[in-house]
Amino acid sequence: MIQMQSVLDVADNTGARSVMCIKVLGGSHRRYAGVGDIIKVSIKDAAPRGRVKKGDVYNAVVVRTAKGVRRPDGSLVRFDGNAAVLLNNKLEPIGTRIFGPVTRELRTEKFMKIVSLAPEVL
C-alpha cells in the first residue's frame, strides 16, 4: 500500500536507487496504490552515471509491496519492501533489466515487458 511521501526501492537498471511517491494516479482523490498501479515519483537517490538524476519526476509502476497481494485462492504474496519500475511518458520501462521477483498481477497488456524482463514471477 503506497501513498504520497512513501519511499520505494527501484527494481531496474536506470541508475535510480530510491524514489518518493508524489502522486497516486487514477481518480481525483485516490489515496493508495498497490501492485500494478501507476504512480508519479521523484528520484531521491541516484547512481552517478545512471540514465536518471536526482530530482527528476517520472511515472512508475509498483511491482512489490510489503502489504502484499491477495489471490483468489486466498493466498497472500508479500515482500520485505516496496519497489517500483520507472516508466517513460508512453508507460514503457526505461530500464533494460528488472531486479528481484515481480507478481503475476502485472501480466496485463500494459506490463508484459516488465514480466518478460523479470528473473522470477510469483
Swiss-Prot record:
For molecular function, the Gene Ontology terms on record are: large ribosomal subunit rRNA binding; structural constituent of ribosome
| GO cellular component entries | cytosolic large ribosomal subunit
Tell me, which GO biological process terms does this entry list?
Answer: translation
Give the SUPFAM superfamilies listed for this entry.
Ribosomal protein L14 (SSF50193)
State the UniProt keywords alphabetically.
Answer: Ribonucleoprotein, Ribosomal protein, RNA-binding, rRNA-binding
Q: Which residues form the signal peptide?
A: none
Keyword Ribonucleoprotein listed? The answer is yes
Q: Which domain of life is it from?
A: Bacteria
Function, in words: Binds to 23S rRNA. Forms part of two intersubunit bridges in the 70S ribosome.
What family does this belong to?
Answer: Belongs to the universal ribosomal protein uL14 family.
On assembly, the entry states: Part of the 50S ribosomal subunit. Forms a cluster with proteins L3 and L19. In the 70S ribosome, L14 and L19 interact and together make contacts with the 16S rRNA in bridges B5 and B8.
Return the protein name: Large ribosomal subunit protein uL14
